[in-house]
Amino acid sequence: VEKGEDVVIVDNLQTGDMGAVNPKAKFYKGDIREAEVLDRIFTENKIDAVVHFASNSLVGESMTNPRKYFNNNVYGMQVLLEAMVRHGIDKIVFSSTAATYGEPERIPIMEDDRTEPTNPYGQSKLIMEKMMKWVSLANGIRYVSLRYFNAAGAIEDGSIGEDHSPETHLIPLILQVPLGKRDHITVFGEDYPTPDGTCLRDYIHVLDLADAHVLAIDYPRRGG
């Protein structure tokens, strides 16, 4: 919205919050797996490009309920791509994950490193990437897939931030301790190749990630 784009948001609000929706954006409550919903949205609005965030994303949950991840993530991508082809929309930016790589062979991970997901979440995202590749070859859709880990942070004025119930993300859990909402934080692992044996993690700030998606939209617009 701040870049001057006309934004249309589609969310079933299972984990989303209307309070985070910019009032200048047009909002539809709907599910990506509902073809009739996508057809109505694509008919009522002049859509130039799609930015796809609609996925389940908890690694642990994906191990106990992989069906949920293949249904929402993979089937959702199928319904979306079919709707895009029907309506002549040929650009998509996809929120993927570094979990597509599995256990990295080297640090930092390079884009062309081998992809060997170790959980259904990462596997579902890799399948979604491959779906875009083949639809691109068959129907001319241009796509960008962004693989990242550990998005964190909040907007600078604090009006929008992480909001999960129950909370599962590390940084919000840590902040609950000084706020008196949690007695302590537990750090798991003691055999990593680090000075104290605990795990190292890297993070990307959500505002940087938002900028990356805006830049990624321009890539297929320029013919990439």
Residue ranges, per PLM feature:
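Short, cationic motifs built from Arg/Lys/His that form the positively charged side of catalytic pockets
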Residues: K125, R147, P195-R201
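Pocket-edge positions in alpha/beta enzyme catalytic cores
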Residues: G30, F42, Y69, E162-P166, ...
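Alpha-helical substrate-binding/gating segment
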Residues: A151-A154, P172-T194, R201-G224
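The catalytic Tyr-centered alpha-helix of NAD(P)H-dependent dehydrogenases
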Residues: R106, P117-S124, D163-I171, D202-V206
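N-terminal Rossmann-like NAD(P)+-binding domain of SDR-like oxidoreductases, especially those catalyzing
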Residues: V1-A151
